[in-house]
Amino acid sequence: MKRLVIFLTAAALAASACSGSDAAPPTTTGTAPPEATTTSVFRTAPQLPLNEGDGTFAVGTLFPLTGEDSALAPALTGSAQLAIDDINEAGGVLGQEVLLFEGDSGDNATDTANQTVDQLITSGSDVIVGAVATDVSQRVIDKIITSNVIQFSPANSWPGFTDYDDNGLYFRTAPSDLLQAGVLADVINRDGRRTVALTYQSTEYGEALADAFTQSFTELGGEVTERLPYPPDTTDFTAIADVILRSGADTAVTIGFDETAALVETLDGLGIGPSTYPVYGVDANTPTIGTLVSDPAVVDGFVGVEPAVGTAFLFDFTQQVDDRAETDGFYVYAPETYDAIIISALATEIAGTDEPSAVAAQINDVTRGGVQCSTFADCLELAISGEDIDYEGLGGPYEFTDAGEPTAASFRVLTYSGAATPDPALDEYVLSR
């Protein structure tokens, strides 16, 4: 088994940033791809080549090798390499070995992602897996799709991507935040809570999630007795906490980011902190809130949900990822990355071409409505025999909508028990579908 990995190095990106169309090609472990043409254009890049397929399926990765999310990169890179290895061991795609181009997305403080996307497109990537951060994807999505290349994120959850004008070329294995709202409502209802005081950032993110939660909880027979929006720069939550105290609601739900720590500390000061009064959060605040409060005891009892796969149950997968990268046991978005590549490869085989728009037309159906299968080799055998397939991935059954996103996903229910991080002994995993 061979894997041709082509690394888009920092030196190549720096050269392309400085020299325009005279950019040096990326460093490779095989035949060098075409010389890259770079651009500073933010939204579209009409001078980049239009991908019409060349018979060889190529995957580019847009992962945070540098920047604030760089801790995620090893597991993402290792899972991508594992997917390519599994595909090539099963015979490749369209009778050819799959190519892997590895690139850095950086973070939103840099223009690294734009430069990397230029390299990935000119190198012949048929699908770009990434980015992780929604704001990074927002910066590059138009450049990718106007070059007739598929973008497939393992992590983006912004609801706005559902109806984005993407020419049918954007997909994600991560669920929309709106699916998370339904899971949170289910958990609160299961816990016997019937009335909720709901606080949320008055941003597009906060309002969309608050509306979705309100609808889901109401459909379950619950009642949102208070809706308490606040500006994202709020630091004083005294007035909001006082309304919650007087509301009579039997629980509070917080939809926000790091500022949630100040809200919870204020609630605790009124005697209605999570240790005595049920308080729930979402993926944007739950995993880190224990490190942001003055004393972890303040968040004892805090409960939240986040999209996550129980990788403790995927020992063989995580072991193979560890063989390819130093993950330190951190596998966030690794199953979703693996699945994005497998789904794309199967869609390419079914399409009979690596021309991205033809591949994209097959992606949704790979995840729904056929004979269930869970490995590339098994699914490929079924597809070759003429069967419609339904890929059941490491991250879940997916069941993509026509918009190219999951209707089924795995979520982790996290609970704090006095420490600065959620108590893993109290973790639950639920499948929403």
Where are the model-predicted features located?
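C-terminal motif of bacterial Sec signal peptides marking the signal peptidase cleavage site
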Residues: 14-17
